[in-house]
Swiss-Prot record:
The lineage of its organism: Eukaryota, Metazoa, Ecdysozoa, Arthropoda, Chelicerata. Expressed by the venom gland. This is Ponericin-W-like 32.2. It comes from Lychas mucronatus. GO terms for cellular component: extracellular region; membrane; other organism cell membrane. The keyword Membrane applies.
């Protein structure tokens, strides 16, 4: 009987830990999925600005 109670306690503890970790990783994933596209857009804009700057320099060269 004591062994069954211990197994039940271990099962519930494991269940709680798994649910908490799933919630934490789920929130981190959703946050990351929102931030990554923003970061990629920032880098692509910098590249576009650099290309436009080079085009202007080429036009202005005598």
């Amino acid at each position: 009987m004591k062994c069954k109670k211990q197994l039940l306690v271990i099962f519930f503890a494991y269940f709680l830990v798994v649910n908490e970790s799933e919630a934490i990783f789920g929130s981190l994933f959703s946050l990351g999925s929102k931030l990554l596209p923003t970061v990629f857009k920032l880098f692509s804009r910098k590249k576009q600005r650099a290309l436009m700057k080079r085009d202007l320099e080429d036009i202005m060269d005598p």
